[in-house]
Amino acid sequence: MAKEVIIGIDLGTTNSVVSIVDNGSPVVLENLNGKRTTPSVVSFKDGEIIVGDNAKNQIETNPDTVASIKRLMGTSKTVHVNNKDYKPEEISAMILEHLKKYAEEKIGHKVEKAVITVPAYFDNAQREATKIAGKIAGLEVLRIINEPTAAALAFGLDKVKKEQKILVFDLGGGTFDVSILELAEGTFEVLSTAGDNRLGGDDWDNEIVKWLIDLIKKDYKTDVTNNKMAMARLKAAAEKAKIDLSSSQQATIMLPFLVMQQGSEPISVEATLRRSQFEEMTSHLVERCRKPIETALADAKIKISDLDDVILVGGSTRIPAVQQLVESILNKKANRSVNPDEVVAMGAAIQGAVLAGEIDDVLLVDVTPLTLGIETAGGIATPLIPRNTRIPITKSEVFTTFEDNQSEVTIRIVQGERPLASENKLLGQFNLGGIRVAPRGVPQIEVSFKIDANGITTVLAKDKDTNKEQSITIKNSSKLSESEIEEMIKDAEKNREADAKRAEEISTIIQAENLVNSLEKEMNDGNIVIPEEEKAKIADYIKEVKELINNKDVEQLKKKIDELNAAYNMAKSAAASSNKDDSLNNNSSSNNDEETFE
């Protein structure tokens, strides 16, 4: 019986790669055309599904061709080709099935299991979509691992005994990640990760396409933007020019018979693009790579001088301006000992071999890229799992109700770095009902977050009194938009002072409401006998506090809370009921501090 092989797959935006471990070392498998990378392109023609090189060859002539589908993974968007709407998972599954088939031909037996890589900044929906695509393709996806982490595995496999810190800069066709890892005694620990889910080589191509469109408008008085075939040819020519400019100072773009115009000669385009022009038109894209590097270093709490190596991953790192930016920021030459197109798949194969027990003494410790939490009273985002926390992890915290006789709570799960829930990404929500009717602050609702090794999150809420529970696995969040990914941490830093002030205002108001509710309840219950004169003073303070709550005068409210607490404590002393009163005061403080649902 043939030995079971777990293949490693880098399912890329532009190209995909499949690898296995043979005799303890990762090996990239060539496709049926003898190439080590396979274009992530699917074409439909005469009822046949064509994948890879042959599909890419049809981009310019066959409108039923799909490329860069990875950018739609985890969204509700579809692509209309072959007279049908296809979900991104379906197209990705066709690519995976193609990789699976040629792997089986190379290995000589059936392949059923795989480790697939994703960008570190992929959210839950995108990770789930990747697993679903694998399932459609007939693969059991044993593990989803982050691309920079996989690259580090491949780079460091023969260096596991040497302690070192490495930065992996991963710029692919459609996504960008920076991860910092520590390698020591066979452990690959991710210290931090940052990135942009919507930045990649496609964006550099698109800048050349825009330049060509403008050139054609100016020189030929023709707009080709509505001509699908012409645009496909421009895109292909732009990609080729970008690649040429990585090794040459200029690229010649030739597009014969680009547009056939009725009653006139066909338009043929010939243009020369200099590297200096290309770098000028794409400088804003290069600059977008800066912040994630700085964020990853800050989150890892290390200095640039602490880095032992810098690894460039992804075909887009061949762009000279990108290399120059990385090396200028880090003041270190990048290590070019790995193939940027292949190293991620090789790392995935290594992880597969670890899972299969073929490779020992290697432990991978990854992290979650953004903070996860829930919305609590006043719209506060209460974090449960901070960004760059090791996974897998389970974390629980107890919350309570905000209203008297509240029989249901809504759990809203948010992702991001801002203190207010509305300014973060809403990943999902669910209701927990059947809570026993009780005064606010009495029910105990335990909320548990579980992030598995694939980075997929499950949230469970349980009423500790009735044991009723409800849970959700985050599958329906859409992909973080370009602006959200790029701005999320930057906004948090820029607005930290204002956010903190707003969050403090909300917390102060909630504290005041809880205090008033607690004191009124204690006095009305008659558990403590307070002299009428003192009771009148407290009632006046409570009235003033309520007015300040309505007016949202937070600074005055803080002072009045202190005065109310002082007056109440004096009244208790006057009542000379120390034991009972001490207990009451402790309970009051506890209630004031407890976080609640609205």
Curated annotation (Swiss-Prot):
Query: Which lineage ranks, top first, belong to the organism behind this chain?
Result: Bacteria, Bacillati, Mycoplasmatota, Mycoplasmoidales, Metamycoplasmataceae
Protein name listed in UniProt: Chaperone protein DnaK
What conditions trigger expression of this protein?
A: By stress conditions e.g. heat shock.
CDD domains (UniProt xref): ASKHA_NBD_HSP70_DnaK-like
- State any single GO MF term: ATP-dependent protein folding chaperone
Source organism: Mycoplasmopsis agalactiae (strain NCTC 10123 / CIP 59.7 / PG2) (Mycoplasma agalactiae)
Q: Where does the UniProt annotation place the signal sequence?
A: none
Extract the ranges annotated as region (Disordered).
571-598
Q: Give the protein family.
A: Belongs to the heat shock protein 70 family.
Q: Which PANTHER family does its entry note?
A: HEAT SHOCK PROTEIN 70KDA
Q: Which residues are annotated as modified residue Phosphothreonine in the UniProt record? A: T175
Q: Which domain of life is it from?
A: Bacteria
Keyword Ubl conjugation found = no
Gene (UniProt): dnaK
* Record's compositionally biased regions (Low complexity): 571-591
Q: What biological function has been recorded for the protein in this entry?
A: Acts as a chaperone.
Which terms are listed as keywords in the entry?
ATP-binding, Chaperone, Nucleotide-binding, Phosphoprotein, Stress response
Q: Which PROSITE patterns match?
A: HSP70_1, HSP70_2, HSP70_3
